[in-house]
């Protein structure tokens, strides 16, 4: 039995959120394959940590046990992560950024100690990660705003194995503007079902400290 951590980083009301519908659909299909897996949901709107932004006044105390170590340990305790995030002003959401700032900690999720070339080595190489992203514009309209690739590179930096992301794009263009989240996500249903089945089939690997 695997432990699956579902991280939600959308600030939009759940009833009208494309990210919420995409995530719920994916988890539903995942559980059809692995009904006994343990699912842990982390809604970043509901935890104080994700409301705290790194700045000059809190730098000394930002990486503490409650806000940082707890969530790093959580990542080490699970086998798979689903990270759901909409594009917000050409970037990841503010809560997603706050979360990542708390867990991207040297010698805890990545390290330069064991590198022979001087680059960082990720310490979460047990994790498999599925990114579920949404955006109003079609992919490529704003090349500087590829939040999906931003997330993919960030999780890979921590050593995780990121499978092919699912991006639901173009939700705000005229032909899609009047579609509900359910209607728009229905158009990706076959892809979601397939990727959820593939993700469910990945092995559950326990975290181990990197051997020196």
Curated annotation (Swiss-Prot):
Its EC number is 1.6.5.-, 1.7.1.17. One of its GO terms (molecular function) is oxidoreductase activity, acting on NAD(P)H, quinone or similar compound as acceptor. The keyword NAD applies. InterPro entries: Flavodoxin_fold, Flavoprotein-like_sf, FMN-dep_NADH:Q_OxRdtase_AzoR1, NADH:quinone_OxRdtase_FMN_depd. Transmembrane segments: none annotated. It comes from the Bacteria. It catalyses: 2 a quinone + NADH + H(+) = 2 a 1,4-benzosemiquinone + NAD(+); N,N-dimethyl-1,4-phenylenediamine + anthranilate + 2 NAD(+) = 2-(4-dimethylaminophenyl)diazenylbenzoate + 2 NADH + 2 H(+). FMN binds at residues 10, 17-19. Its cofactor is FMN. Binds 1 FMN per subunit. Keywords: Flavoprotein, FMN, NAD, Oxidoreductase. Gene3D superfamilies: 3.40.50.360. Quinone reductase that provides resistance to thiol-specific stress caused by electrophilic quinones. NCBIfam families: PRK01355.1. Belongs to the azoreductase type 1 family. Homodimer. This is FMN-dependent NADH:quinone oxidoreductase. It comes from Malacoplasma penetrans (strain HF-2) (Mycoplasma penetrans). The gene is azoR.
């Amino acid at each position: 039995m695997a432990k699956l951590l579902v991280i939600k980083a959308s600030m939009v009301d759940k009833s009208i959120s494309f990210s919420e519908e995409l995530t719920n659909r994916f988890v539903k299909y995942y559980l059809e394959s692995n009904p006994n897996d343990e699912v842990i949901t982390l809604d970043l709107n509901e935890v104080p940590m994700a409301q705290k932004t790194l700045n000059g006044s809190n730098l000394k105390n930002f990486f503490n046990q409650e806000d940082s170590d707890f969530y790093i340990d959580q990542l080490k305790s699970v086998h798979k992560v689903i990270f759901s995030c909409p594009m917000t002003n050409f970037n990841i959401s503010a809560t997603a950024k706050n979360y990542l700032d708390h867990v991207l900690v040297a010698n805890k999720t990545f390290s330069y100690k064991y590198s022979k070339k001087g680059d960082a080595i990720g310490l979460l190489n047990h994790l498999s990660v599925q990114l579920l992203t949404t955006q109003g514009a079609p992919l490529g309209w704003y090349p500087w705003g590829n939040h999906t690739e931003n997330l993919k590179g960030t999780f890979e930096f921590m050593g995780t194995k990121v499978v092919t992301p699912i991006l639901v794009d173009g939700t705000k263009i005229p032909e899609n503007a009047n579609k509900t989240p359910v209607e728009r996500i229905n158009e990706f249903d076959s892809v979601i079902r397939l990727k959820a089945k593939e993700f469910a089939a990945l092995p559950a690997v326990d975290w181990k400290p990197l051997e020196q």
